[in-house]
Design a protein with these regions (language model features):
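Bacterial signal peptide processing site
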Residues: 28-30
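Short solvent-exposed beta->alpha transition segments
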Residues: 58-109
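Short, aromatic-enriched amphipathic alpha-helices that serve as compact interaction elements
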Residues: 37-53, 63
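Bacterial N-terminal signal peptides that target proteins for export
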Residues: 3-15
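Exposed beta-sheet edge and beta->alpha loop/turn motif
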Residues: 98-143
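C-terminal motif of bacterial Sec signal peptides marking the signal peptidase cleavage site
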Residues: 23-26
Length: 143
């Protein structure tokens, strides 16, 4: 149970930071921290979505930072992601994307992230993906 609580805290904190960045900067006009490039962040986020769509959760997990890998297993990724793909059907396209960045003052790290909306045969899935300075994934949220 403690591991699940830790995962929830990490995901909630990351989501709150990304949402605050979007709200405070006018929907994605946030300047990325030094060392990040919009094109690289967008490309990495799209790569993670491609792996999600292919149900290649091991490769998706491998994109993660050590902290992310310690907080979730490949099997947990599958359990969380499969229902979305089962419900929404075949992937069509990314219809919206916003790239932003900020600093996690608690962890003392700069991060960059993307919020992307994927259109699927039977619905939409919103992805929030964030990366640290090494471009390792520190967050992968779907809703």
């Amino acid at each position: 149970m403690k591991k699940r609580e830790h995962i929830t805290r990490v995901l909630v904190r990351g989501t709150a930071a990304l949402l605050a960045a979007v709200i405070l900067t006018g929907c994605g006009k946030a300047k990325l921290p030094e060392g990040f490039e919009v094109s690289a962040v967008k490309e990495k986020a799209e790569q993670s979505i491609e792996l999600f769509n292919a149900r290649d959760y091991e490769a998706l997990w491998e994109m993660g930072s050590d902290e992310l890998k310690e907080s979730i297993t490949v099997e947990q990724f599958a359990q969380a992601c499969d229902p979305y793909l089962d419900k929404c059907g075949a992937f069509e396209e990314i219809s919206k994307s916003v790239v932003m960045g900020g600093t996690d003052k608690n962890a003392g790290i700069d991060y960059a992230g993307a919020v992307m909306v994927g259109d699927y045969e039977d619905g939409k899935i919103q992805f929030t993906v964030a990366f640290d300075q090494n471009m390792e994934m520190i967050q992968f949220l779907i809703k």
